């Protein structure tokens, strides 16, 4: 989930270290970080009085990692397979003598001027300290080729046929300076489910940034959040541009990490971060993953795209935003037809560059938040962070017809002191001329990016935008009898996105930034049902998979990766979304780090991949 601070970036030794005990090393030769933990024990569970009781049992993996039979039939027109082990091998850059000399000089500048003078003696804030940001199960792992016929506790529902995928940050190289969790290289974890059987694989998304850094053998692209603050951030930017001018790197091919969102659209699985174009990732018949390349929608997309596009469940249209932190227009809105034809951009006039991580759609509108976390690059000159909480700014939400050709039809409605990093759903209520927005209001708004002594709170909130009066109201959704809990990552039934929904499935983000379980929230009554992962168990986004042919809104299953920090083992849990009952736990052959967002690709969609 790289911040779009990376947007203004684009206008050694490979010794393995123990990633779970990572500590910052000021070295000009960073090490390769990836190193999976061996699994010794796995957990078994039973549901007792609505909570999950955990015990440990010996691991008994007898996995066939070389099964010759494909996990789904090979389509007649399937492209020639790429062997990831071969494509992942580093290829040294073909520099001439002058470039090699220039590279050595710039490396000396980085070591002696930036690291030893500008950065030495300045303690890193927790939000940029690698020892904090990528410690424990936030640390990276190595790639895994497909492991088939995984052990399963319980029974995988036979109606689940397809692949669950989840994206996350997984830095290949040890940071040379500051590092935020959002800065890591993208890695996709995939669990194939078919006829009660499961397989697992994980691969880096082969971004242009990753390929160039692998060729050089070290991290050379600036870390958007971890490094780009203060005078050292300016120096690292200048160093980056110097390397580009000398042909040592090519930022025109993209600087993004593709570590945040995943969506399946127009027969393609897309991995996204808001600092670049999306990347097309292909799911292979044997359960493996391969990166097809940077995807520009056949030349139609020339700008970055945020990592939370929206897919209308009725029209199958794709809606997205793109924002810029340097030049106007700071924000653009566009859409794609179901077959991938792009609309003209709609320029949204904003007075200053604003963080735009998420937005919402209804049947007829797009809902665009313009909130109080903004970009002020000049703050770096004064030694600060360019990501700023502007307390003087009044947050507002824009309501724009989906098919508007310009921003003249935009209606802005103030929603003071509101910062929603994510919006879970939105719908129209014509009887009151209101648009309802469901989101998690976060305080302090910039706490993810800047160190704060105030504890983070993420309050599930209903915001009402009255289109007739131009006023807004908001209220916390949980009933007063329920103690406040942080509800942050999750979703509603995607088949009802943009329409009135009753339920949301959201991660219990406690103790922050870990996730100790998830909640099924009744958005009307405020009642919640909790599924807790037990002592030492933590996960991430709960992903709702609707049951095919079922009309019930909660008819389906919730999938979530869960890691046991006591034993070092990871599982995929499958819960019944209606009664919150655990159906199955798939034991995974390697540790799955905490990550970001997922998607589910059905067996039918697997056959139709481009």
UniProtKB/Swiss-Prot annotation:
Gene name, Swiss-Prot/TrEMBL: NCED
Subcellular location per the Swiss-Prot or TrEMBL entry: Plastid, Chloroplast
Name of this chain's protein: 9-cis-epoxycarotenoid dioxygenase, chloroplastic
Protein residues bound to Fe cation: 308, 357, 422
Transit peptide: 1-53
Disulfide feature: none
Enzyme class, spelled out: oxidoreductase
Biological processes, Gene Ontology terms: abscisic acid biosynthetic process; carotene catabolic process
GO terms for MF: 9-cis-epoxycarotenoid dioxygenase activity; metal ion binding
Function: Has a 11,12(11',12') 9-cis epoxycarotenoid cleavage activity. Catalyzes the first step of abscisic-acid biosynthesis from carotenoids. Not active on the all-trans isomers of violaxanthin and neoxanthin. Contributes probably to abscisic acid synthesis for the induction of seed dormancy.
Keyword terms, alphabetized: Abscisic acid biosynthesis, Chloroplast, Dioxygenase, Iron, Metal-binding, Oxidoreductase, Plastid, Stress response, Transit peptide
Family: Belongs to the carotenoid oxygenase family.
UniProt tissue specificity: Expressed in flower buds. Detected in sepals, petals, lips and lip crests.
Cofactor(s) recorded in Swiss-Prot or TrEMBL: Fe(2+)
A cellular-component GO term for this protein: chloroplast stroma
Annotated catalysed reactions: a 9-cis-epoxycarotenoid + O2 = a 12'-apo-carotenal + 2-cis,4-trans-xanthoxin; 9-cis-violaxanthin + O2 = (3S,5R,6S)-5,6-epoxy-3-hydroxy-5,6-dihydro-12'-apo-beta-caroten-12'-al + 2-cis,4-trans-xanthoxin; 9'-cis-neoxanthin + O2 = (3S,5R,6R)-3,5-dihydroxy-6,7-didehydro-5,6-dihydro-12'-apo-beta-caroten-12'-al + 2-cis,4-trans-xanthoxin
Location, primary (coarse class): plastid
Domain of life: Eukaryota
Pfam families with a match to the protein in the record: RPE65 (PF03055)
Cofactor binding, note field: Binds 1 Fe(2+) ion per subunit.
Iron listed as a keyword: yes
PANTHER family assigned: 9-CIS-EPOXYCAROTENOID DIOXYGENASE NCED3, CHLOROPLASTIC (PTHR10543:SF26), BETA-CAROTENE DIOXYGENASE (PTHR10543)
EC number(s) per entry: 1.13.11.51
């Amino acid at each position: 989930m790289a911040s779009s601070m990376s947007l203004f970036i684009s206008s050694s030794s490979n010794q393995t270290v123990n990633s779970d005990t990572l500590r910052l090393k000021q070295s000009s030769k960073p090490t390769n970080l990836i190193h999976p933990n061996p699994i010794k024990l796995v957990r078994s569970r039973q549901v007792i009085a609505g909570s999950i009781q955990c015990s440990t049992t010996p691991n008994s993996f007898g996995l066939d990692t070389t099964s010759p039979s494909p996990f789904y039939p090979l389509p007649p027109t399937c492209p020639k397979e790429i062997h990831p082990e071969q494509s992942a091998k580093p290829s040294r850059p073909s520099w001439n003598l002058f470039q090699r000399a220039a590279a050595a000089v710039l490396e000396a500048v980085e070591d002696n001027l930036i690291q030893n003078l500008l950065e030495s003696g300045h303690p890193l804030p927790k939000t940029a300290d690698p020892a904090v940001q990528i410690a424990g199960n936030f640390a990276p792992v190595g790639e895994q080729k497909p492991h088939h016929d995984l052990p399963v506790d319980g029974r995988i529902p036979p109606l689940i046929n397809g692949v669950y995928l989840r994206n996350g940050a997984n830095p290949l190289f040890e940071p040379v300076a500051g590092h935020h969790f959002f800065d890591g290289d993208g890695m996709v974890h995939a669990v194939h489910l078919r006829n009660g059987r499961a397989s697992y694989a994980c691969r880096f998304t082969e971004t242009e940034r990753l390929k160039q850094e692998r060729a050089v053998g070290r991290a050379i692209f600036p870390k958007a959040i971890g490094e780009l603050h203060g005078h050292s951030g300016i120096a690292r930017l200048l160093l980056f541009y110097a390397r580009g001018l000398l042909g040592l790197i090519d930022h025109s091919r993209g600087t993004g990490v593709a570590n945040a969102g995943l969506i399946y659209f127009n027969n393609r699985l897309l991995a996204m971060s808001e600092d670049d174009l999306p990347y097309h990732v292909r799911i292979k018949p044997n359960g493996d993953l391969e990166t097809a390349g940077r995807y520009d929608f056949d030349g139609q997309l020339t700008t970055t795209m945020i990592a939370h596009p929206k897919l209308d469940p009725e029209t199958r249209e794709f809606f997205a935003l793109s924002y810029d932190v340097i030049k106007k227009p700071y924000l653009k809105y566009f859409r794609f037809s179901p077959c991938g034809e792009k609309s003209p951009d709609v320029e949204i006039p904003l007075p200053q560059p604003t963080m735009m991580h998420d937005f919402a759609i209804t049947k007829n509108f797009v809902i665009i938040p313009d909130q109080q976390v903004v970009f002020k690059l000049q703050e770096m000159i004064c030694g600060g962070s360019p990501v700023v909480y502007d307390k003087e700014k009044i947050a507002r939400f824009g309501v724009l017809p989906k098919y508007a050709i310009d921003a003249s039809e935009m209606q802005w409605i103030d929603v003071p002191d509101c910062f929603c990093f994510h919006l879970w759903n939105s719908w129209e209520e014509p009887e009151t001329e209101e648009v309802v927005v469901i989101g998690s209001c976060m305080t302090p708004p910039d706490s993810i990016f800047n160190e704060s002594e105030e504890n983070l709170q993420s309050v599930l909130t209903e915001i009402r935008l009255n289109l007739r009066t131009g006023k807004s109201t908001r209220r916390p959704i949980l009933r007063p009898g329920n103690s406040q809990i942080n509800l942050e990552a999750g979703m509603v039934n995607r088949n009802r996105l943009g329409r009135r929904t009753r339920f949301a499935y959201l991660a219990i983000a406690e103790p922050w930034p870990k996730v100790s379980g998830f909640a099924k929230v009744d958005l009307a009554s405020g009642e919640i049902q909790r599924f807790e992962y037990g002592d030492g168990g933590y996960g991430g986004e709960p992903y709702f998979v609707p049951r095919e042919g079922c009309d019930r809104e909660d008819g389906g299953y919730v999938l979530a990766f869960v890691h046991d920090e006591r034993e070092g083992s990871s599982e995929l849990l499958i819960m019944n979304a209606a009664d919150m009952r655990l159906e199955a736990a798939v034991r995974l052959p390697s540790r799955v780090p905490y990550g970001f967002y997922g998607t589910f690709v059905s067996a039918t969609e697997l056959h139709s991949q481009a």
